[in-house]
């Protein structure tokens, strides 16, 4: 009898791509895929593990899935970043877990399951399967994926790892150095996605702006974008994530002039105080960040800018926080996320002093998020009565509205557009929506036949 396998994918879009690759490999090896954990014989939790809250979510999910061992679940696998970072602890402290698969072991997932079942009746073999290949290959990304995003968009991972050495971040230790995929492999995957009806391709990496530097000796993102934009069927190309110090004039011009590149950038800035940026090991300066933001706004009309910030980094005093707060107030980001600093063992910032009290970190986060809420309110009001090309993604739970996204919203992290239509709509298609109302971070509108922005 075919074994039913379910995957719970936690964390970032890059992790989702890895989950989709595992799904594709499992399907290829004749496993049955299920989204219902209750009926799964094998449950895989693809974990995130780079900050405390992500680790907690991963551990809680593993324990929750372990409860299904009282039902149909015969095998529980922990994969991904937490598995890579804490394999010994998982093996020792979580007896419910049957196998641990690190970030370089995704392409072995079918083998992991098959070996478990072949040894299941061997009373003498109690050892857990641990798959941690010491490889820097990105070839696993060339395996055919089983898409979990079924409404017109898909992520396309163009590299793995990171060469930045931010003092707070564990990702280079978990995922290894930056490794670009071959351009022809990425183009081939983009063509595959277009053939599946994908209209929006989201190029994703820890830092897309340095794509190609390690492989070709120079940055190749603009060339890659041009190649992808030539693929029939792809209408939107979105870039996640772009480091400010690597955004150059060539890239700005491409974003401004290429109609398929959505005018949206997610630029992780983290702070605006030069003192804190230096302590963080960031390559940017406050002046450099401001210059690139000014250039983007001047050269790319209607560009939507998202950023992420860290408050409560060791040594951040009231003066540093005021610099950050005033920076957010001045630059009025369209989208913004704020993390409180997470003290991660094995990172240089772990031993920095003084560490900031949790209550102070939370207070600073709340202050910036309140400011951002006011900024978003004003920006959303400016979108009233305008018409936007919108990707239809689904129907609301009450069945009254369709929902989707304009160029100004990335999946999962930004708001949505809720809208009515006189005619039935297909998911994964584009319509023109006139914005009539706002609801906090979301927009409300109706489908019309006018041309869109």
Curated annotation (Swiss-Prot):
Protein location: Cytoplasm
A single GO cellular-component term on record: cytosol
Keyword list, A-Z: 4Fe-4S, Cytoplasm, Iron, Iron-sulfur, Metal-binding, S-adenosyl-L-methionine, Transferase
InterPro entries reported for this sequence: Elp3/MiaA/NifB-like_rSAM, Methylthiotransferase, Methylthiotransferase_CS, Methylthiotransferase_N, Methylthiotransferase_N_sf, NA-bd_OB-fold, Ribosomal_uS12_MeSTrfase_RimO, rSAM
Main location group: cytoplasm
Cofactor: [4Fe-4S] cluster
Start and end residues of each Radical SAM core domain: 148-378
Chain sites annotated for binding [4Fe-4S] cluster 2: 162, 166, 169
Entry's Gene Ontology molecular function annotations: 4 iron, 4 sulfur cluster binding; aspartic acid methylthiotransferase activity; metal ion binding; protein methylthiotransferase activity
Record-level GO BP terms: tRNA modification
Domain spans labelled TRAM: 381-449
Cofactor binding note of this UniProt entry: Binds 2 [4Fe-4S] clusters. One cluster is coordinated with 3 cysteines and an exchangeable S-adenosyl-L-methionine.
Positions of the MTTase N-terminal domain: 3-118
Binding site for [4Fe-4S] cluster 1: 12, 48, 81
KW Chaperone (keyword) present: no
Entry's EC annotation: 2.8.4.4
Reaction equation(s) it catalyzes: L-aspartate(89)-[ribosomal protein uS12]-hydrogen + (sulfur carrier)-SH + AH2 + 2 S-adenosyl-L-methionine = 3-methylsulfanyl-L-aspartate(89)-[ribosomal protein uS12]-hydrogen + (sulfur carrier)-H + 5'-deoxyadenosine + L-methionine + A + S-adenosyl-L-homocysteine + 2 H(+)
Top-level taxon: Bacteria
Family membership noted in the UniProt record: Belongs to the methylthiotransferase family. RimO subfamily.
Function: Catalyzes the methylthiolation of an aspartic acid residue of ribosomal protein uS12.
HAMAP family the UniProt entry points to: MTTase_RimO
Protein name: Ribosomal protein uS12 methylthiotransferase RimO
């Amino acid at each position: 009898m075919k074994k039913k396998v379910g995957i719970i994918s936690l964390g970032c879009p890059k992790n989702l791509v890895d989950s989709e690759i595992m799904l594709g490999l499992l399907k290829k090896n004749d496993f049955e895929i299920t989204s219902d954990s209750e009926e799964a014989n094998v449950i895989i939790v693809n974990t995130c593990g780079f900050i405390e809250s992500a680790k907690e979510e991963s551990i809680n999910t593993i324990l929750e899935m372990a409860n299904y061992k009282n039902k149909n679940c015969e095998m529980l696998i922990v994969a991904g970043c937490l598995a890579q970072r804490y394999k010994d602890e998982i093996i020792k402290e979580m007896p419910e877990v049957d196998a641990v698969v690190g970030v370089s072991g995704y392409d072995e997932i079918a083998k992991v399951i098959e070996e478990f079942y072949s040894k299941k009746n061997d009373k003498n073999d109690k050892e857990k399967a641990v798959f941690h290949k010491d490889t820097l290959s990105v070839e696993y990304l060339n395996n055919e994926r089983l898409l979990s995003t079924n409404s017109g968009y898909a992520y396309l991972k163009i590299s793995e790892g990171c060469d930045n050495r931010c003092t707070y971040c564990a990702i280079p230790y978990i995922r290894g150095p930056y490794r670009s995929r071959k351009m022809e492999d990425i183009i081939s995957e983009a063509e595959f996605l277009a053939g599946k009806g994908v209209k929006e391709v989201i190029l994703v990496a820890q830092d897309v702006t340095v794509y190609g530097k390690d492989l070709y000796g120079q940055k190749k993102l603009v060339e890659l974008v041009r190649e992808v934009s030539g693929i029939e069927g792809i209408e939107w190309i979105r870039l996640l994530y772009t480091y400010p110090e690597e955004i150059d004039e060539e890239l700005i011009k491409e974003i401004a002039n290429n109609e398929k590149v959505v005018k949206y950038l997610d630029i992780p800035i983290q702070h605006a105080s030069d003192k804190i940026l230096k302590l963080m090991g960031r390559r940017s300066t406050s002046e450099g960040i401001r210059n690139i933001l000014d250039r983007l706004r001047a050269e790319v009309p209607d560009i939507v800018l998202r950023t992420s910030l860290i408050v409560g980094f060791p040594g951040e005093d009231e003066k540093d926080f005021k610099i950050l707060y005033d920076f957010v107030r001045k630059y009025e980001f369209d989208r913004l996320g704020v993390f409180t600093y997470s003290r991660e063992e094995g990172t240089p910032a772990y031993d920095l002093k003084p560490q900031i009290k949790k209550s102070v970190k939370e207070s600073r986060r709340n202050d910036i998020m309140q400011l951002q809420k006011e900024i978003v309110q004003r920006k959303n009001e400016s979108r009233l009565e305008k018409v936007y090309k919108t990707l239809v993604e689904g129907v609301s739970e009450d069945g009254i509205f369709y929902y989707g996204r304009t160029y100004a919203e990335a999946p999962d992290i930004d708001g949505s557009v809720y809208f009515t239509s006189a005619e039935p709509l297909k998911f994964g298609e584009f319509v023109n929506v006139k914005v009539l109302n706002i609801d906090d971070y979301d927009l409300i509108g109706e489908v019309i036949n006018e041309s869109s922005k």
